Amino acid sequence: MPADSMQGTRGPATADPGNNPNTLSHRVAIVLDGAIFACFCGIAVLAPHNVHWAFVLFLVALCIWTLRLLAGKKFEPQPFMLPALIFLALATIATALSYAPALSRDRLGWFTLLALAVVTAQNVSSVKQVKILVLLLLASTTVSVARTGWQYVHGIGTELVTIAPDSTLYHRGLRSGDIVQAINGHPTRTPQQWSAALQATQADKTLAVRFARDAPLQIYTWEVDGNDFRQWLSQPGNIVQRGRPPRAQGHFYHYIPYAGMLLQVGLLTFGLLVSTWKQWSAARWVLIMIFLGIAAALLATVTRTYMAALLLGCAFILWLTQKRIRTAAILALLLSFIVGTVWIEHQRQMGWLALTDAGSEYRWLMWKDAPRLIAQHPMFGMGLDSEFLRGEQWNLAAYKKFPLRSHFHSTFIELAVDCGLPCLAAWIWLMAAYLIFLGRHWKQAEHWDSAPRGVFLGIFGGAIAFIMSSLVHYTQGDAEVMLLIWLFMGIAIALVRILASSAKRLEKAA
């Protein structure tokens, strides 16, 4: 990331002012502050790969910061505290009254990630630290994107293209499109490995076939008769090919949170790209490659909402910054929309608003049942995730028609059902206050150096895209996405504080 004249700018959230640097307490404070920042660095590295370990680092940072507060560290003014505390308090009450207490407690634990915004805002103390965190996040995401690209170029196994319903393998449980990854422990991820595995197991009577199926990918190991398998291979028309994931999901359990993570990092990258476009050619090309890679990986998830949100976020960023090319930005948005439509039609045989596909029908059925459940418990809801346990008792139409047991596919509807209307109101208050904060301070950010301006711009675009996607996805339930939302909120608050403090010092010096 390019260097700026303000890269060393520090805010007041460093080691406590007035301390003698030679005292033990001051040295301990510096070590603890360094440990907190190290946790932030770990979170940035882990966010695109493993949210559980990132959550552990968040808890470590929270504990260390609490010790620093008890030792006298100053608590800086923090926006959004009131709606955030009310939201968590109401969610806690809903959990206490839940129809499924165990499920609700687990979900509430993830809701506490909201505190990451506070810990980050209170402890990120310089623009240089922001740069380091962003650099680590972009590098780690690039690794994830490269892995996804490798899966599509190299493949993840050998696909059994067609298995007829009257074949023995079909009755044994194998299906067309299954991607075989190993046979009796021999890997089959490339055509060469496939041939070697068949050669090594040609005398085996029973074959333990490890294969991947469905989206998100599920891994199974089933035993089949070796002669049946070899007979199927010898029949004309039964072919195999390099197997690729139906939908990209990275290291995550599902393609939806992976798409949500890519959306946020992609818009952060785009904000930096727009901000540094005219100044640093080397950084520009690096950011272009990162953004295109993220966009391609997001396209591979075939997730309509997040693809549309990326287009909207990019258009919003261009609208804010490039007033002379607003018309061109709109035309580019329309062109991208057309390309995305063609891609979705090809990959999923549906358009953007395919109301007849199973996923859209499931979502619509859940939405239709939501008002009835909200009316029964309008104040504190049914309890977080309680529909997973009590959905059949509540006569949810989607549960009757489909085997899937899932949520209401909208953050706003989910919060109203699970936690009640007051909690939903607190959430809307929090999000509205955040957007107002970003909009108000963007006028100041326009005059910052390119790196902090680009970070702030990308976070602003990501917040807009997040709100949009929350309408039709339960984004609050995807910790992989919320980790970045709260981290970015904290960084935005820290940037405003740091650079405002720097501007005041410059004014006094003048």
Model-derived regions: residue spans:
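Hydrophobic alpha-helical segments of polytopic membrane proteins
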Residues: A115-A117, Q122, G266-E345
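A conserved mid-to-late transmembrane alpha helix and its immediate loop/hinge
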Residues: P246-P257, P371, H377-F380, K401-L438, ...
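Transmembrane alpha-helices of multi-pass inner-membrane enzymes
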Residues: V60-T66, L267-L268, L310-L311, R326, ...
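Hydrophobic alpha-helical transmembrane segments
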Residues: A91-T95, K128-G157, V209-G237, A296
